């Protein structure tokens, strides 16, 4: 074909580069972000196969074959064409598979929606069809009215006066990148971009709002020699931009702060993809900080009662995952901002066909990221988005969010009608803000730069000279692009559009502010590849004197760069392939710059509000050059766009953003640890004289005895009377207190466990948690005994306590201990049913061996589906039995005798016939049922518990309620375990992996991501030991025992 000649010329040009480019030292592909390894042939494939069908490629191959010779050149050409042809076929095959996958997903979504709607049988007329505006959170109980929109300074003052009585404590979390309050190194790497600026400015703005006492922005402490020392400072105060109005509210600990929590490698700055194994460590450190700060604020402004966060706000998937765990541990509301979504990224990469799903996951840890986002949807009260596009086209890709079902649920909530255990987070569009107080749009032009003798001007900012030195004619309008050198920012297409449009080149200059660099060789491979491509294009089109690309700029220089472009009557351009929001567009508009922006993503919403420029297809060079030329050449259009931007920019101010943000937060139903309102001071010293009295208070505040120890686990009927429950608790307290008063003094001396202080676990110097998952009862018993025997000395002294953590019920635990000759009093606490129940050893054997902590249930019951969830699970089990059972054999059955109010247990006869745990989680999420599904005991049992319940979260609860130091816990696990196994191996606690125990990994065979993506076995907190001889040595190695 005539149009195919360039293919061979391109191939030959690549071959001329030489074979040395094929090795791993070469720069990565321009078009792929963070690709890793690069070969010229793959680069060619990326450029060709998306635009030519296989007929064209086949003809190129025929051409190569026709000129075959013994020479290496033609052999390589032939092989290359074969590879291209094969990849083109693979691309088509992938497209077919992708179409099938999307069709299957659509059917699953429709089926789930039908089943959910069928359960919710009440009919509504228009309520479930329209997008009803309601400020009730999706959890559903709050009825606070929404505050009116503020459109003037007068109404803002009125709103501020109404908020002065509030003393809110807010926590923001953003984990990756380098975060500091001043001189942010935006563009230094792909992790330090717009999100960093957004979270810092949001924290600063919230800290200046009336009614907000303190804001903490939690991030990672980085003490690496590769970064500035400031990133290793534990705390940094964010100075308000303008605090005169609210200075009277400032207190000792008030304001906004960056708090850096140490986690991960201490002396190494690592990319976000490698942070996943270390997130539990952050959760434990952040939990400790928040509890400490809550108590401090309580002493200052809370009349001695802790001031719990009004909300914890996670940013991006990693922080969202951490925030979900913190929300559960502290029982406070969660917010989420996704910024960039993993499922959307996966869809784009699969659509390109350049990487397999396995390669994508290996590079980006994309499946772990998606699971973090799904968990965040399970837990979040509200998801804040920048644009409507993010909701309609990105969040709807997730199992946990369905816009249609969300509207149905919201309509039911508004009418106080049951949702049958279904919950959906509320999606709220709140565009990011900006501080405009100190921005003065430049009204002059380039002729005014030098000033005159009568009206001297202030010296030009140094960055102006740094940019203008590149230009042979600095008087021309300046087209400004400000983005890091990342393939998705599409800078090379911009340079091509500029270089190929002669009229544009004659009328304007191009300034590319692409982050900071010292040397190209010192940049990341992706960034250096983009920059080298830009430089080659400048040379190709001979753009010397017309394009600026300075090496350095400070964050404080950015406003001056905008002013320079506006002074030259230039244009700001954002040509990104897709832009989640586009904060730089708002900044540019505030400085009087019209915009040309991508039509994909957030710029569409910004343009709708500002009406200050043109939208373009980022893949269309001609469209980009025409839009730029139109704005630069038409002065009337330029002036109109400038004026529109300045007129409408106030709608993106930080006060407006924060007002909407705070109005939403204050509409939430308050959530915080319940016991704190009645028996504060739980974390006092364990030897305090008030301990004995507090024990009785604790019992009266939702601690119930299991009187017979027979395993009657259905102790709290959701339909039952609260008065019955209250009378039983009061009777238990009377019996317990009578028994205590009548005890002889000698009985108190038996051991410290029964010294009258409850629970005994509070007084231990360190805690051993036995979390061995069942391979067989005998093996588990033997390993448990060996662990107990290894610390016999410390056990006798009372310095060590034991917790048994298991998927069994409390009655099964008792039978298990008795069968092995163990006494329940050997343990201080029991975490049962995979973390849905927490029991303590009873102080009085006459009342039964166990006490259940009811406050733990109130702590984990958030979004528990109850009877609606139970019915759905039974329906799922029935459908499975109908499909796969032989001879009427039931594969999965509900075990009523093992189930409790917060754990639905199913027994499994044929584990191989049951879908993987991820499939059941997916099915429930599609129906808006939020829960934690745990496959246990080698797949023979399924426990379905509240979404915020787990064995590791139960340990965090012990820290929150009783002050038990997580760093003083040693969790014993096997080599594998239940599907919640990964949660037990990360965090501040120590982990001992027993060799040869729980070796079967059948439950982990169909994981979405490998365990190595989420567990750091090289951590100093994880050791391996043999249950026969190394247990004590392992505890010494973890520094919990001394010689």
UniProtKB/Swiss-Prot annotation:
Instruction: Please name the CDD domains in this protein's record.
Output: HAD_SPS
Q: Which residues in this protein are found as Phosphoserine? A: 121, 125, 152, 155
Please give the superkingdom of this protein's source: Eukaryota
Identify the stretch annotated as signal peptide in this record. Answer: none
Keywords (alphabetical) are:
Glycosyltransferase, Phosphoprotein, Transferase
Please give the activity regulation comment for this entry.
Activity is regulated by phosphorylation and moderated by concentration of metabolites and light.
Renumbered to this chain, the Basic and acidic residues biased-composition regions fall at 95-117
Pathway(s) annotated for this protein in UniProt:
Glycan biosynthesis; sucrose biosynthesis; sucrose from D-fructose 6-phosphate and UDP-alpha-D-glucose: step 1/2
Q: What class does this enzyme belong to in the EC scheme?
A: transferase
- This enzyme's EC code(s): 2.4.1.14
Q: Name one GO biological process term.
A: nectar secretion
Q: What induces it?
A: Circadian-regulated, with the highest expression at the end of the light period and the lowest at the end of the dark period (in 12 hours light/12 hours dark cycle). Induced by cold (at protein level).
Keyword Glycosyltransferase on this protein? yes
Q: How would you summarize where this protein is expressed among tissues?
A: Expressed in seeds, stems, rosette leaves, flowers and siliques. Highly expressed in maturing nectaries.
Give GO cellular component annotations, separated by semicolons: plasma membrane; plasmodesma
User: Which reaction equation describes what this protein catalyses?
Assistant: beta-D-fructose 6-phosphate + UDP-alpha-D-glucose = sucrose 6(F)-phosphate + UDP + H(+)
Q: Which PANTHER family match?
A: SUCROSE-PHOSPHATE SYNTHASE 1, SUCROSE-PHOSPHATE SYNTHASE 3-RELATED
**UniProt miscellaneous comment:** Plants silencing SPS1 show reduced shoot growth, leaf fresh weight and dry weight, and decreased leaf starch, leaf sugar levels and sucrose export rates. Tobacco plants overexpressing Arabidopsis SPS1 show increased stem height and diameter, increased total dry weight and elevated concentrations of sink sucrose pools.
NCBIfam families, per the entry: sucrsPsyn_pln
Q: What does this protein do?
A: Plays a major role in photosynthetic sucrose synthesis by catalyzing the rate-limiting step of sucrose biosynthesis from UDP-glucose and fructose- 6-phosphate. Involved in the regulation of carbon partitioning in the leaves of plants. May regulate the synthesis of sucrose and therefore play a major role as a limiting factor in the export of photoassimilates out of the leaf. Plays a role for sucrose availability that is essential for plant growth and fiber elongation. Required for nectar secretion.
What does the subunit section of this Swiss-Prot or TrEMBL entry state? Homodimer or homotetramer.
The protein in question is named Sucrose-phosphate synthase 1
Q: Which organism is it from?
A: Arabidopsis thaliana (Mouse-ear cress)
> Which gene name belongs to this protein?
SPS1
């Amino acid at each position: 074909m005539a149009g195919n000649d360039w293919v061979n010329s391109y191939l030959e040009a690549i071959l001329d580069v030489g074979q040395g480019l094929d090795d791993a030292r070469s720069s990565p592909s321009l078009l792929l972000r963070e690709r890793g390894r690069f070969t010229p042939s793959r680069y060619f494939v990326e450029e060709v196969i998306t635009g030519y069908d296989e007929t064209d490629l086949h003809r190129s191959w025929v051409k190569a074959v026709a000129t075959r010779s013994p020479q290496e050149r033609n052999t390589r050409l032939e092989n290359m064409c074969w590879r291209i042809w094969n990849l083109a076929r693979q691309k088509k095959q992938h497209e077919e598979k992708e179409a099938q996958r999307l069709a299957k997903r659509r059917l699953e979504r429709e089926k789930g929606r039908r089943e959910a709607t069928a359960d919710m049988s009440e009919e509504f007329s228009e309520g479930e069809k329209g997008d009803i505006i309601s400020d009730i959170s999706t959890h559903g109980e709050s009825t606070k009215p929404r505050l009116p929109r503020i459109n003037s300074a007068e109404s803002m003052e009125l709103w501020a006066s109404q908020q002065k009585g509030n003393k809110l404590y807010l926590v923001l979390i953003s984990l990756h990148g380098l975060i500091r309050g001043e001189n942010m190194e935006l563009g230094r790497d792909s992790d330090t971009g717009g999100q960093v600026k957004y979270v810092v400015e949001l924290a600063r703005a919230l800290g200046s709002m009336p009614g907000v006492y303190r804001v903490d922005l939690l991030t990672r402490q980085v003490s690496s020699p590769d970064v500035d020392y400031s990133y290793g400072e534990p705390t940094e105060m964010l100075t308000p931009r303008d605090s005169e109005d609210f200075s009277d509210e400032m207190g000792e600990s008030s304001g906004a702060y960056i708090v850096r929590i140490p986690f991960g490698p201490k002396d190494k700055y690592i990319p976000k993809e490698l942070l996943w194994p270390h997130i539990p460590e952050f959760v434990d450190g952040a939990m400790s900080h928040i509890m400490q700060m809550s108590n401090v604020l309580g002493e200052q402004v809370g009349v001695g009662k802790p001031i719990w966060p009004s909300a914890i706000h996670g940013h991006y998937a990693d922080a969202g995952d951490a925030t979900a765990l913190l929300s559960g541990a502290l029982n406070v509301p969660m917010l989420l901002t996704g910024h960039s979504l993993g499922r959307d990224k996966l869809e784009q990469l699969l659509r390109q066909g350049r990487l397999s799903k396995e390669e994508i996951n290996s590079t980006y840890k994309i499946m772990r990221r998606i699971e973090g986002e799904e968990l965040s949807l399970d837990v979040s009260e509200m998801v804040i988005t920048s644009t409507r596009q993010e909701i309609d086209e990105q969040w709807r890709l997730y199992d946990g969010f369905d816009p249609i079902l969300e509207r149905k649920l919201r309509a039911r909530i508004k009418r106080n009608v049951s949702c049958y255990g279904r919950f959906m987070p509320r999606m709220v569009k709140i565009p990011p803000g900006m501080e405009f107080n100190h921005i003065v749009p430049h009204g002059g032009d380039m002729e005014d730069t030098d000033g005159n003798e009568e009206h001297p001007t202030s010296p030009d900012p140094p960055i102006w000279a740094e940019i203008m030195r590149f230009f042979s004619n600095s008087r021309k309008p300046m087209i400004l692009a400000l983005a890091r050198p990342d393939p998705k920012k599409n800078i090379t297409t911009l340079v091509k559009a500029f270089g190929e449009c002669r009229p544009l080149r004659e009328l304007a200059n191009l300034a590319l502010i692409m982050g900071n660099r010292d040397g190209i060789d010192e940049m990341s491979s992706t960034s250096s590849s983009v920059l080298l491509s830009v430089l080659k294009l400048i040379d190709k089109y001979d753009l010397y004197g017309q394009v600026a690309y300075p090496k350095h700029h400070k964050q404080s220089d950015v406003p001056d760069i905008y002013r320079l472009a506006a002074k030259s009557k230039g244009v700001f351009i954002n040509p990104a392939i897709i832009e989640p929001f586009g904060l730089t567009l708002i900044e540019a508009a505030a400085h009087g710059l019209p915009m040309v922006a991508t039509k994909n993503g957030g710029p569409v919403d910004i343009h709708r509000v500002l009406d200050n420029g043109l939208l373009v297809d980022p893949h269309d060079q001609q469209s980009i050059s025409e839009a730029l030329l139109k704005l630069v050449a038409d002065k009337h259009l330029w002036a109109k766009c400038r004026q529109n931007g300045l007129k409408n920019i106030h709608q993106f101010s930080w006060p407006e953003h924060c007002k909407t943000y705070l109005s939403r937060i204050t509409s939430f139903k308050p959530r915080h640890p319940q016991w704190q309102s009645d028996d504060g001071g739980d974390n006092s010293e364990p030897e305090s004289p008030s301990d004995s009295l507090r024990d009785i208070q604790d019992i009266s505040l939702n601690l119930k005895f299991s009187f017979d120890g027979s395993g009657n686990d259905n102790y709290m009927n959701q339909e039952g009377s609260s008065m019955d429950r209250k009378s039983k608790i009061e009777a238990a307290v009377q019996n317990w207190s009578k028994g205590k008063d009548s005890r002889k003094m000698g009985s108190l001396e038996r051991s410290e466990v029964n010294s009258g202080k409850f629970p005994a676990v509070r007084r231990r110097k360190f805690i051993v948690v036995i979390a061995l998952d069942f391979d067989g009862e005998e093996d588990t018993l033997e390993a448990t005994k060996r662990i107990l025997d290894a610390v016999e000395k410390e056990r006798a002294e009372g310095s060590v306590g034991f917790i048994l953590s298991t998927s069994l019920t409390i009655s099964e635990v008792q039978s298990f201990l008795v069968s092995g000759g163990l006494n329940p009093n050997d343990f201080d606490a029991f975490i049962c049913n995979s973390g849905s129940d927490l029991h303590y050893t009873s102080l009085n054997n006459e009342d039964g061996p166990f006490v259940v902590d009811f406050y733990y249930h109130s702590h984990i019951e958030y979004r528990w589906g109850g009877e609606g969830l139970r019915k759905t699970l039974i329906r799922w089990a029935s459908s499975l039995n109908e499909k796969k059972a032989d001879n009427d054999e039931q594969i999965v059955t509900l075990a009523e005798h093992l189930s409790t109010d917060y754990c639905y247990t199913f027994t499994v006869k044929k584990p191989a016939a049951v879908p993987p745990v991820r499939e059941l989680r997916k099915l429930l999420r599609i129906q808006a049922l939020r829960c934690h599904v745990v496959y246990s005991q080698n797949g023979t049992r399924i426990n379905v518990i509240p979404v915020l319940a787990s064995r590791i979260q139960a340990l965090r609860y012990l820290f929150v309620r009783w002050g038990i130091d997580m760093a003083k816990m040693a969790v014993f696990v096997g080599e594998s375990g239940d599907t919640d196994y990964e949660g037990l191996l990360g965090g501040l606690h120590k982990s001992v992996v027993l060799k040869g125990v729980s070796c079967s990994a059948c439950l982990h065979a169909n994981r979405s991501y490998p365990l190595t993506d989420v567990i750091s076995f090289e951590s100093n907190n994880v050791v391996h030991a043999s249950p026969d001889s190394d247990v004590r040595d392992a505890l010494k190695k973890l520094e919990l025992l001394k010689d």
